Each structure stands twice: as structure tokens, then as C-alpha cells.
A protein has these predicted regions:
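Regulatory hinge/linker segments at domain boundaries
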Residues: 1-18
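Basic, Lys/Arg-enriched C-terminal extension of HTH/homeodomain DNA-binding domains
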Residues: 8, 13, 52-78
Length: 78
């Protein structure tokens, strides 16, 4: 379980905004995009836009790749 993901690591490593880092954290925790949007209190379209931005900043193109990248980053930098 990755609920103790420190979003500051994601912000620092990938230059994510706080909102993007929170979305990435929920996705890494196993939530889907709709669940993550609901948890964050944002519209699905907002979450999709943030996800596209996260993909651009991290260089990945799929949620599964993003989760893998986040988990590897946490192992490396925690």
C-alpha cells in the first residue's frame, strides 16, 4: 500500500503541481481515474487534463507505466 506516498517527492522529481501529485498518489494507491477524481472532489475531465499533464512531465503514456514509475521512484528516493 502506498498511502504514505510523500507527494513532495513527486513534486520535486517530476515538477508536478500539488493537484497533479495528489492525483498520481491516488492512482498509485490503486484507484482508477473516476475514483481519484471523486476523492479529490474534481470533475473527471479535470482529472483527465491533469493526467495528460502528468504524462507529459513524466514521459510515460499509460497509467500502469505511471504507477510503476512512481513506485520505483519511492523505492529509490525514500
Amino acid at each position: 500500500k502506498t498511502s504514505d506516498i510523500d507527494i513532495r517527492i513527486l513534486i520535486s522529481l517530476y515538477k508536478l503541481t500539488r493537484a497533479e501529485a495528489m492525483l498520481a498518489k491516488y492512482l498509485a494507491d490503486g484507484a482508477n481515474l473516476d475514483q481519484s477524481a471523486a476523492q479529490l472532489g474534481i470533475a473527471r475531465n479535470t482529472a483527465r487534463a491533469q493526467l495528460r499533464s502528468i504524462f507529459a512531465k513524466t514521459g510515460v503514456s499509460q497509467q500502469s507505466m505511471l504507477v510503476s514509475l512512481i513506485l520505483k521512484s519511492l523505492v529509490t528516493f525514500s
